[in-house]
Amino acid sequence: MFSWCALLAAAVLPPCVSAYQAEPVPAVLSVLTVDRYADDGAPGSLRWAIATANQAPGRHRIEIAAVGRPPYLIRPASPLPEIKGPVQIVGGARDVDGQYIVIDGSAYVRGKGTDACPGAEKGQFGANVRTTTLPGLVLRDTQGVELSGLEIRNFCIGVLINRASGNELHDNRIVANKGGAGVMLTGDDGSGQSTATTTVHNRIVRNEFIDNGDGLELTRGAAWNLVADNLFRSTDANPEPSQGIEILWGNDNSVLRNRFENYSDGLQINWGNRNTIAANTFTGNSIGVSVSGRGNVVDGNTFSGNGIGIAVRPQPRSEANRFSANLLSGNGLKIERCQAGGACVPGQPRGAIVFGVPGLEHASFVGSRGLGVDTDPSKRARICAAGESANCQPAPNHGQAPPRLLALRGGDGQRELQGEFAGTPRSRYTVEVFGNRAAGSDEAERYLGQLDAVVDGDGHGRFRYRLPPDSADLANLTATVTSADGATSPLSAPLALAH
């Protein structure tokens, strides 16, 4: 019997290749052992190992041995050579006794706090000013670099990934890098302009980021990168607790299952598009997530004990960003930590989801924009007041108003929520329903479910939602609505449940 499958296979597969053939076995790498911590360039030093591996990218693995007793400390006297991949650089102690090999920049990054770390513009210093100054390890115009088992501390930028793709940083500690970020992924072309497709498919997983200015940045074209299972923590020792992660003109990145503690903003998106922020935990931040841009998805995260859970910032044109299935409780605290972010405007509304929160780009922002940055309010954008539209920025998410929860009908496990909302005529919306156990809560402690609702020709939408059986312990309900293009409203006013 004639086989079209066999003919097709013969046509598209080279000789002796099966569709089920495993990928080739990786070549055996030559190991360069670092067993001398003096920074003199001699064989056995880290400087020697990087320079040697750079001569033949793809052929070496650098293993840094644990010499003596911890802490295992390498203190470079001057900037190390940029790293050319593919290459692995591994601190050997972590998998043995949990210790890290420390690469410490304090021998040549000198000065008090952020003053040691000037930005690219003269007179500017600190996090959230453009900079590539004094990094520890540099991956520039390269690919395939793997870093693990390292503690990188006391630089202006711990690891700079500049126009570099397909790299992986895992199981490291990134500590007290004060001027730019713990790890900076940027497509910066050298003059501050973005480059597309140069800083993609990097993986930053299972690292600890402690007391950096910004923990991590995805900026100027950084796209399709994964940041997962990391801890971003700021303590009282941090002089400039800015963002756990800043995304600036970065698109299509995935930030998953991380924890963000005690920053001005846990995560800040500045005109980034289609980024996915999912299954993370935000606590103790002035703002959990601060959003501008379009098509971003904030889904299934937990926000507790923040000033604002999700802050949605105005921009020149109102764009749609989606917030779905997030758990929000205990927010609304007066956390006035405003280092290039946060919520410090007197009388600022706080709580679960707040529209119209000013950022650095707005004249009404209160806080630090970075040392040396021009603060003239006449050069900043105005946020439109109610009923205003000229020379100001409109409400975000198309100004989508929250739904109104009208009544609860039925009983004995058959309770049905009834509500209404305003929307675009003849269009579909998604309603998400939440519950709270505390009678005074107006947040979204528990996610109950969702339903679709259609708006009639007069712009009026109605919905009914049957509550699940496990909702008997709830004191009240709240809800959001999301348009077909992904613009989510703030939470509704709560509707009390009679027991």
Q: What feature does the model see in each segment?
A:
Residues 145, 150, 167, 172, ...:
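Consensus "Asn ladder" position of solenoid repeat domains
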Residues 16, 20-158, 163-165, 327-349, ...:
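N-terminal, post-signal-peptide segments of secreted/periplasmic proteins
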Residues 486-498:
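Edge beta-strands of extracellular beta-sandwich domains
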Residues 85, 133, 165, 200, ...:
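Residues that flank catalytic or metal-binding motifs in active/ligand-binding sites
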